[in-house]
Design a protein with these regions (language model features):
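Membrane-embedded segments
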Residues: 73-130, 134
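A cross-family acyltransferase "interaction/gating" segment
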Residues: 99-100, 147-236
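Aromatic (phenylalanine/tyrosine) cluster motif
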Residues: 273-275, 285
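Soluble extracytoplasmic domains of inner/organellar membrane proteins
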Residues: 119, 126-136, 140-153
């Protein structure tokens, strides 16, 4: 209970400190508008005891659309901790207490599925993010699941993204990269099907209860897997693209689940990103762009712009 209170107090203090800084950065279009969310979510993951391993590489090609699976509110801080991104979210998120404000400060694009006549405005906003060089994250399932499986991808969401491409680039083309977030371990032990929903937040689950339970469980191991990017043109068949992305994300998720808490190929050609829980407790947490090894500054693992 004491740990939960201390963590909550630290998160509140950090949030109150960074909100005005991020707001000013957005108004001034300063580079820090991308870096502040990365640093904030890294610190948040560290405080929550989330340990992340990154498999594969995020492409540096732009414009870039990332299509991922979705099982928890934790997906957002985890993805942002490893890459400076913006999200496409449903309109209801904008009205959620605190989470809605944080989503706005991360320059999320909100989609109102009930107001089809607003589609043009939404597409223009997505196009603006792509033109600015921001990787845009789209949750292909359109909802969250229990984390044990990848739900069918909604072709309408892919179609909406395609419509935005025409405005984003003269040729209407973009790179689209599959992305998987898989919760694989708890306190160093493999997280099986029965316990994976401990990390998931879906249906009508209460946020406060889920947050409290998360603090009780200890260190949570997560694998973030980057798939091979594919070119996506305005004339592409959205159904075929959606099926391909769904298959790739499902394959990445299954590979991570079978690989246990270290994910597939641990110790081989992976890109480890494990400072979150343990290094933060040792006082070794570093802000994006300020990581030091042997007294020398090195680039952060999220290749911040």
């Amino acid at each position: 209970m004491l740990r939960a209170l201390l963590v909550a107090a630290a998160i509140v203090a950090m949030t109150l400190f960074l909100i005005p800084l991020q707001w000013i950065s957005i108004l001034l279009r300063a580079p820090t508008r991308r870096l502040i969310p990365v640093g904030y979510h890294r610190a948040l993951c560290a405080l929550l005891g989330i340990r992340i391993r990154v498999m594969g590489q995020r492409t540096r090609l732009r414009p870039l659309l990332l299509v991922a699976n979705h099982s928890s509110w934790l997906d957002v801080p985890i993805i942002t901790a490893v890459a400076p991104v913006v999200f496409v979210a449903k309109q209801e998120v904008a009205s959620w207490p605190l989470l809605g404000l944080l989503a706005k400060l991360q320059r999320s694009v909100f989609v109102d599925r009930a107001r089809r006549h607003k589609t043009g405005e939404v597409n223009a906003e997505i196009a603006q993010r792509l033109n600015d060089g921001d990787p845009v994250v789209l949750f292909g399932e359109g909802t969250s699941s229990d984390g044990n499986r990848v739900l069918p991808f909604r072709t309408a969401l892919i179609g909406a993204a395609r419509d935005a491409l025409a405005a984003a680039t003269p040729g209407g083309g973009v790179m689209i990269q599959p992305l998987s977030i898989t919760y694989v371990g708890l306190n160093g032990l493999p997280l099986g099907r029965q316990h994976r929903p401990l990390a998931a937040w879906y249906g009508d689950m209460d946020f406060v209860s889920h947050f409290r339970d998360l603090l009780r469980h200890g260190v949570l191991d997560v694998v973030v897997s980057w798939g091979e990017p594919i070119p996506y043109q305005a004339e592409s068949d959205r159904k075929a693209v959606a099926r391909s992305l769904e298959s790739r994300v499902r394959g990445l998720t299954l590979a991570a689940q079978r690989g246990g808490r270290h994910g597939p190929g641990a110790g081989s050609a992976s890109q480890p990103f494990l400072f979150m829980a343990k290094e933060a407790k040792r006082g070794r947490f570093v802000w994006p762009g300020l990581r030091r090894r042997g007294g020398r500054r090195t680039d952060p693992p999220c290749d911040a712009p």
